[in-house]
Amino acid sequence: MLAVHFDKPGGPENLYVKEVAKPSPGEGEVLLKVAASALNRADLMQRQGQYDPPPGASNILGLEASGHVAELGPGCQGHWKIGDTAMALLPGGGQAQYVTVPEGLLMPIPEGLTLTQAAAIPEAWLTAFQLLHLVGNVQAGDYVLIHAGLSGVGTAAIQLTRMAGAIPLVTAGSQKKLQMAEKLGAAAGFNYKKEDFSEATLKFTKGAGVNLILDCIGGSYWEKNVNCLALDGRWVLYGLMGGGDINGPLFSKLLFKRGSLITSLLRSRDNKYKQMLVNAFTEQILPHFSTEGPQRLLPVLDRIYPVTEIQEAHKYMEANKNIGKIVLELPQ
């Protein structure tokens, strides 16, 4: 089968597509013939040598994919049959023509969505769902500040925040992105390149601050985050795009806010946790991708590349130009 590969860590120029052995499904696993796989920041970090796959995971890039069930391993429980369409949450391996998946990490394709659209859901939407509900304990009426609000996770988080009855606020780096955030349901957006998002957030909330922050930036934002955090607020850190170093009195500022700093990753969670998350998402959220009206959810796709243009896809994401997801299509 064909798969994305790199021989040494470095820039996008190291990526290429090569022939590798097709995997075989193990106990309780399904072999998925991949139609499409979306790009995530973790793919860029792994390519750079900064994010190793979890033990036992494929070293091929790709944390989410959609396609057709091609083979069932021993011990499968009969939830899937050969030929079914499905989308999958993966610890790696999605950017290849075939990938093995524990059957509990597969989800049905929502009615009305293409396989390419569906590939943009698993990692991004399950991450946003986990951050808001399982980690951040979002409540109706909460102000939620979403950094990188027009990323894949960000576009999902805006919509899920609205669904929870909370109020999404976003940061982004262009007017175009902020306009899209408003269309998705953001109550306000702040251009971090042109204004102090912390002061703008406090002004919008009439000095109260935000109850929940979803932060994939990290170090460079710490002081502004604490400044606009409400009393007893929750700050959920799930990425370090702005670095991991802190200089200054973070703990004292956080303490006087009675604030909570919580860290979270999804990729390294065990399969039992991921299956619980997939089940909850499938039951509570997935139907809303197919309903009509204001509660309908929408995976936001920016660009679609053939997998042979993997270098261009990485360059585009690294330039922070994307609004929503970048999806790779695999040859069928």
Curated annotation (Swiss-Prot):
Subunit relationships: Homodimer.
Induction profile: Isoform 1 and isoform 2 are both activated by p53/TP53, doxorubicin, etoposide and ionizing radiation. Isoform 2 is highly activated by UV radiation.
Superkingdom field: Eukaryota
Organism of origin: Homo sapiens (Human)
Effect on the protein upon substituting residue 51 to A: Loss of enzyme activity
Binding site for NADP(+): 41, 148-154, 173-177, 192, 264-266, 322
UniProt keyword annotations, A-Z: Acetylation, NADP, Oxidoreductase
Effect the entry attributes to changing residue 51 to F: Increased enzyme activity
GN (gene name): TP53I3
GO cellular component: cytosol
Known role: Catalyzes the NADPH-dependent reduction of quinones. Exhibits a low enzymatic activity with beta-naphthoquinones, with a strong preference for the ortho-quinone isomer (1,2-beta-naphthoquinone) over the para isomer (1,4-beta-naphthoquinone). Also displays a low reductase activity for non-quinone compounds such as diamine and 2,6-dichloroindophenol (in vitro). Involved in the generation of reactive oxygen species (ROS).
The protein, known as: Quinone oxidoreductase PIG3
Reported effect, residue 180 to K: In a breast cancer sample; somatic mutation
Membership in a protein family: Belongs to the zinc-containing alcohol dehydrogenase family. Quinone oxidoreductase subfamily.
